[in-house]
């Protein structure tokens, strides 16, 4: 377990260092006060022998309180079987340092092990509760993307916990999001990238900040009513000290049978999750300890599990989910919690209570809904076509909005969907932007508009245009940029009124674009948000304001925290590939159409524009209806000559009304 305290049992700081190693090993610890770095020589450091733990011959320990140490902060590392040239860091270290290599740090005060205290007493403020899973709007935050190098041309992410707290949190609070999904912040060799290759599972990345700074970040989020969901990598590890201590018990070799049942290793070491000959699963225990530590020490409000497909072990993931929930409920019985899987095989069934799942129960609470992203992008590119023998376009639209089923474009058929909005995390873009159909949504919308009018829509051209809106871009380019932002507003209308938990990638809220080639797997991870683009033009700021309106609606309107949805209009030729593409739906909150406290969404997903369009209407008092996040230029809602209403609908435009 983490080498600092009995965090579950509340017994305070543990004086022992404990690490796993192969049975029969000789394990020594060598250490020195960090203030002695002017005489840095690890070979001359004090050394002590660890002893095997009684009844656990694959664990070794030493009692630091018994060493008679003077007060100080000590860096330490382990030596296995006398090989001084290959020191090993503590895989359970909770506080690390870097100087000629990575090491853990333990602290001694008055001859006993000590650690810096952290006050959580002021964690919450009046009027800022943590919202439940049905009210969430998640902000996906690659920490390193939150700040770029001063030399703008370099595009290197340098985000830290401190920068986000003091530069961005208030703005995110004003935007209205109430959860942050942190891309991995545990220490990783991929320090300038996303961090999907953890080295130390119990310590934050040194380049992002110290443990106290990550705790302060979480506390500052909680004070603003923002939950923090930790993205954790359990499929594999990169340069993790466990590999030096006991590789065979924690990781797979190419000859292991389990290896053939697993996915990509991404150039790292795959964890071993099948039981060994003795029925033991040390790698599972390692991950369960990690969950406990992040919950109790960092007050995690949930987890996002990377590479569910690659782990390919539903029973273990269910065990992880159940254990995390139990620890969280024990520590914070009145707080919400969630475990989300990233399953690129898109199996909504893992969120269901069904006999085929392990123990007949759900495996995770929620999953990323890839199908929503893909179908929405087909909507805005005019590619949501119907074919003979396949479901009608209106069915595909229903599934996209409600999540009742999901469309698999490879098999060209529908698959099981979701039973509750909290089971699906919907999004326009995620951090993984490599393929053309995955790139930032603003690039996706703007590129074809430029190309249709004879301009180029490459990453470099869009970057140039976005950065020269006030000087250099011609009137046509300026217009097309504004048109793309208007279509992005419409995409947010769909995202924030569909059934599911909406997630927004950092920067999408104001239409940020790629600065680097997203097709390059390295560059795609090193492309920080350009915050200056929030005010690159009045249209960018206007989009941010409209998104804030929609988020406020999503988090406060009762109809959007429930599942009930009724489609009350499709154009008669909607299912024809040449027909008008207008439809309308209502989030009813379970009441009949025409009741108060309902949300109405009118959508045109075709290339035709309508200065005047009539649809049926069930709500009598137009004066009691508010339009939310309206387009900059539109005809207001008005009664027509019959029993409906009339409004304008531009191409690929969505309009949202609240009763």
Annotated model-derived regions:
Residues 533-574:
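Aromatic- and carboxylate-lined catalytic core of secreted/periplasmic carbohydrate-active enzymes
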Residues 639-659:
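C-terminal beta-strand-rich structural cap/linker in extracellular carbohydrate-active enzymes
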Residues 1-21, 44-45, 49-138, 147-156:
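The feature marks proteins involved in alpha-glucan
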Residues 100, 104-107, 321-327, 334-519, ...:
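Conserved alpha/beta catalytic core and glycan-binding cleft of carbohydrate-active enzymes
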Residues 137-141, 180, 228-230, 303, ...:
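Hydrophobic faces of well-ordered beta-strands that scaffold small-molecule active sites
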Residues 93, 123-133, 142-299, 308, ...:
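Substrate-binding/active-site clefts of carbohydrate-active enzymes
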Residues 529, 542, 550-552, 614-641, ...:
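C-terminal accessory region downstream of the catalytic core in glycan-modifying enzymes
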Residues 15-22, 27, 605-622:
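Surface-exposed beta-strand/loop patches in extracellular or lumenal glycoproteins
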């Amino acid at each position: 377990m983490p080498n600092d305290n009995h965090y579950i049992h509340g017994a305070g700081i543990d004086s022992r260092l404990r690490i796993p190693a192969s049975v029969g090993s000789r394990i020594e610890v060598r250490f020195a006060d960090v203030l002695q770095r002017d005489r840095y020589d690890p070979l001359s450091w004090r050394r002590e022998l660890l002893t095997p733990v009684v009844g656990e011959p694959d664990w070794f320990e030493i009692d630091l309180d018994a060493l008679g140490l003077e007060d100080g902060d000590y860096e330490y590392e382990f030596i296995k079987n006398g090989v001084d040239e290959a020191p090993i860091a503590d895989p359970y270290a909770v506080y690390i340092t870097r100087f000629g290599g990575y090491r853990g740090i333990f602290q001694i005060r008055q001859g006993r092990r000590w650690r810096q205290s952290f006050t959580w007493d002021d964690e919450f403020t009046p009027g800022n509760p943590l919202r439940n899973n049905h009210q969430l709007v998640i902000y996906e935050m690659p920490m390193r993307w939150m700040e770029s190098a001063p030399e703008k041309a370099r595009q290197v992410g340098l985000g830290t916990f401190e920068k986000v707290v003091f530069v961005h949190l208030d703005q995110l609070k004003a935007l209205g999001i109430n959860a942050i999904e942190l891309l991995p912040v545990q220490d990783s060799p991929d320090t300038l990238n996303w961090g999907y290759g953890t080295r130390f599972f119990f310590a934050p990345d040194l380049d992002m900040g110290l443990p106290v700074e990550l705790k302060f970040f979480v506390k500052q989020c909680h004070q603003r009513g923002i939950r923090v969901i930790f993205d954790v990598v359990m499929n594999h590890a990169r340069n993790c000290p466990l590999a030096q201590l006991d590789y065979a018990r924690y990781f797979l070799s190419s000859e292991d049978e389990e290896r053939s049942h697993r996915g990509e290793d991404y150039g790292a070491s795959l964890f071993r999750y099948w039981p060994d000959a003795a029925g033991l699963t040390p790698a599972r225990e390692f991950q369960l300890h990690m969950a406990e530590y992040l919950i109790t020490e960092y007050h995690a409000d949930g987890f996002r599990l990377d590479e569910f497909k690659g782990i390919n072990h539903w029973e273990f993931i269910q065990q992880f989910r159940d254990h995390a929930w139990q620890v969280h409920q024990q520590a914070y019985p009145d707080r919400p919690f969630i475990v989300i899987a990233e399953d690129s095989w898109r199996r909504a069934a893992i969120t269901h209570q069904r006999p085929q799942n392990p123990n007949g129960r759900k495996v995770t609470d929620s999953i990323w809904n890839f199908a929503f992203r893909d179908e929405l992008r087909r909507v805005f590119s005019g590619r949501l076509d119907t074919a003979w023998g396949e479901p009608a376009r209106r069915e595909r639209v229903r599934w996209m909005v409600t999540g009742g089923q999901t469309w698999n474009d490879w098999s060209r058929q529908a698959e099981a969907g979701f039973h509750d909005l909290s089971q699906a995390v919907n999004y326009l873009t995620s951090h993984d932007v490599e393929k053309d159909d995955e790139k930032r949504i603003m690039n996706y919308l703007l590129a074809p508009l430029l190309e249709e009018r004879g301009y180029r829509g490459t990453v470099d051209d869009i970057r140039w245009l976005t950065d020269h809106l006030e000087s250099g871009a011609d009137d046509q380019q300026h217009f097309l940029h504004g048109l793309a932002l208007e279509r992005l507003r419409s995409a947010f209308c769909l995202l924030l009124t569909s059934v599911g938990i909406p997630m927004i990638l950092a920067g999408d809220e104001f239409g940020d674009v790629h600065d680097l080639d997203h097709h390059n797997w390295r560059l795609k991870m090193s492309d920080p948000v350009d915050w200056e683009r929030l005010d690159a033009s009045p249209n960018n700021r206007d989009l941010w304001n409209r998104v804030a309106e929609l988020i406020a609606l999503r988090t406060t309107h009762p109809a959007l925290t429930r599942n009930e949805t009724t489609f009350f209009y499709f154009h008669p030729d909607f299912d024809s590939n040449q027909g008008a593409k207008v439809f309308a739906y209502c989030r009813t909150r379970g009441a009949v159409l025409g009741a108060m406290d309902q949300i109405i969404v009118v959508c045109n997903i075709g290339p035709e524009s309508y200065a005047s369009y009539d649809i049926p209407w069930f709500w009598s008092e137009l004066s009691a209806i508010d339009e939310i996040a309206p387009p900059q230029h539109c005809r207001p809602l008005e009664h027509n000559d019959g029993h409906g209403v009339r409004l304008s609908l531009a191409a690929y435009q969505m309009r949202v009304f609240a009763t």
